[in-house]
Amino acid sequence: MTLEEFSAAEQKTERMDTVGDALEEVLSKARSQRTITVGVYEAAKLLNVDPDNVVLCLLAADEDDDRDVALQIHFTLIQAFCCENDINILRVSNPGRLAELLLLESDAGPAESGGASQPPDLHCVLVTNPHSSQWKDPALSQLICFCRESRYMDQWVPVINLPER
């Protein structure tokens, strides 16, 4: 590996870390503002009703999910819809970290019936614009810029890895 190749690889790694940090910040703010929709079915309903307010679509799958044909069909349809409606898409390669970000300790707890509750479907997460004010968030702007740059390089659904904490 030449020095130039090493430098380019290092810059790409740093950029991915920055994008991952920006995504964490966006998810944290959206979670506190309750502008997140979680689940493939719930996301499809929202996209059908109000696609103009969706600013970001996250698709999360691990290696086991890659063999789930039904999930991959859902992903393909959601990706096509998002591309058609100019909604930014990111694919998250570590859904476990995404679950940590979205399901904090306060949300977790035993079901009232005494049994374990069904974990929510985190394969698709939508972030919407709050109706009260237009987001002027630098982290969201950074994600949108990253998605746009990826599309210019013909990478329509860039894959990012959320940094572990």
From Swiss-Prot:
GO terms for molecular function: kinase binding; promoter-specific chromatin binding; protein heterodimerization activity; protein homodimerization activity. One of its GO terms (cellular component) is cytoplasm. The keyword Manganese does not apply. It is found in: Nucleus. Induction: By UV radiation, X-rays, growth arrest and alkylating agents. The induction is mediate by some kinase(s) other than PKC. GO terms for biological process: cellular response to ionizing radiation; cellular response to mechanical stimulus; centrosome cycle; negative regulation of angiogenesis; negative regulation of blood vessel endothelial cell migration; negative regulation of transcription by RNA polymerase II; positive regulation of apoptotic process; positive regulation of JNK cascade. It comes from the Eukaryota. The modification Phosphothreonine is found at residue 2. It holds the Pfam family Ribosomal_L7Ae. The keyword Magnesium does not apply. SUPFAM superfamilies: L30e-like (SSF55315). Keywords: Cell cycle, DNA damage, Growth arrest, Nucleus, Phosphoprotein. Interacts with AURKA, PCNA, GADD45GIP1 and MAPK14. Might affect PCNA interaction with some CDK (cell division protein kinase) complexes; stimulates DNA excision repair in vitro and inhibits entry of cells into S phase. In T-cells, functions as a regulator of p38 MAPKs by inhibiting p88 phosphorylation and activity. Belongs to the GADD45 family. This is Growth arrest and DNA damage-inducible protein GADD45 alpha. The lineage of its organism: Eukaryota, Metazoa, Chordata, Craniata, Vertebrata. The gene is GADD45A.
